[in-house]
Amino acid sequence: MILSRRMIGSLAMTWLPFADAASETLPLRQLLRLSLFQVSVGMAQVLLLGTLNRVMILELGVPALVVAAMISIPVLVAPFRAILGHRSDTYRSALGWKRVPYLWFGSLWQMGGLALMPFSLILLSGDQTMGPAWAGEAFAGVAFLMAGVGMHMTQTAGLALAADRATEETRPQVVALLYVMFLIGMGISAVIVGWLLRDFDQITLIRVVQGCGAMTLVLNVIALWKQEVMRPMTKAEREAPRQSFREAWGLLAAETGALRLLATVMVGTLAFSMQDVLLEPYGGQVLGLKVGQTTWLTAGWAFGALVGFIWSARRLSQGAVAHRVAARGLLVGIVAFTAVLFSPLFGSKVLFFASAMGIGLGSGMFGIATLTVAMMVVVRGASGIALGAWGAAQATAAGLAVFIGGATRDLVAHAAAAGYLGSLHSPALGYTVVYVTEIGLLFITLAVLGPLVRPGSLFPKKPEAGEARIGLAEFPT
């Protein structure tokens, strides 16, 4: 049998990963192009939370407290994602666009923040010949604020646009693809930026960070080009009263179980994320792992999360109830954190590595299941406020978790060193308090999640067998 070029092309498109995410309203080519905005957000995420963190502390000699304050600025902006989503839902223009203007201005904010950032960091390091002494802190704060606002605005509007164009059947697969593109953006950016900054100097820092800002604008323009249909509006339509944020939030809160779902996501994210900055130090300080060995902990966590993603997607495709899958993820997390506490007692490095994988497995199961439910919350056909509220809850909880986890460990360690805790002065004490707290939060999350399984709550029924596919209901920021 001779295959024509058209048949071969159609087969190739069918065999592509996430080919089932395409639909008549959002073809695969347009979906792949739209997903480029996630690459730019992933790139900014790597810069703000990873590369520039190291550069400020090691190469520029900025105090760690100042670095922590700067990095926390994008997290402080996260709660406003719900407002940004609502504004994009109710935005009116002569062209009829709702999402594209927010994508565009979010791109400008993000690019502007990255353009200003290298100069402000150089000032922050003390390399200043004129001007007020506080100029470095002020300009660095403005740069991080601009980049943070741009990231949140771009991501919220982009996800809402994808949700608008996708069908009910393909929406989870669409958001799953966007999540994968976010990870790809982070991975590629980390490798390229790290390679470019291997021989560090101030000129190289300026070129790399501003180059990322320029790439942000290029990627996002390609992503948003001809993605939203123009629906011209008359002057009377544009001047008609708009729904207020309070009214929209009231409608969202009126959805059965919506606020409980957000509370579940916040507490669960807090429980799983407090250990993010402590896992590797715990392995090194308590179990005596070398630097090369501790890096495998993060790899094990990521592998566990991937297994949790695949297993949960398979269970959902077989008709499992999403809330019960989430509960199983919480139980796995409880067992994993308990194993972390027992690993130094047995002196078992193998148990500790298995615990790291278990934490990833539990968080993956919990995240996929709850996010599958979140995408179904649509208020009067507007998905922006729901997506914004979801992103605000998740991002805020993750940021608070990192701060609370690190602060708790340091406070307990200092109290023990000062003798306030009597004979309790083990190096593992501060970490133990954090892990026990996380176990308690996981039990609280189970209690909050329980009523959602009842009939009448969000997504109480089982999907038909074979109906669910591998996909995310929302993007975990």
Curated annotation (Swiss-Prot):
Give the UniProt keywords, A-Z. Cell membrane, Membrane, Photosynthesis, Transmembrane, Transmembrane helix
Q: Does the keyword Transmembrane helix apply?
A: yes
Q: Where is the signal peptide?
A: none
> Is the keyword DNA repair in the record?
no
| A single GO BP | photosynthesis
**Disulphide-bonded residues:** none
Question: Where does this protein reside within or beyond the cell?
Answer: Cell membrane
Query: TM segments?
Result: 31-51, 60-80, 103-123, 130-150, 177-197, 205-225, 248-268, 291-311, 334-354, 359-379, 384-404, 433-453
InterPro entries, alphabetized: MFS_trans_sf, PucC, PucC-rel
In the bilayer, the protein is annotated as: Multi-pass membrane protein
Q: Which GO terms describe its cellular component?
A: plasma membrane
Under Gene3D superfamilies, the record lists: MFS general substrate transporter like domains (1.20.1250.20)
**Positions in coiled-coil regions:** none
**What is the similarity comment for this entry?**
Belongs to the PucC family.
Q: What is this protein called?
A: Uncharacterized protein in puhA-bchM intergenic region
Q: Which organism is it from?
A: Rhodobacter capsulatus (Rhodopseudomonas capsulata)
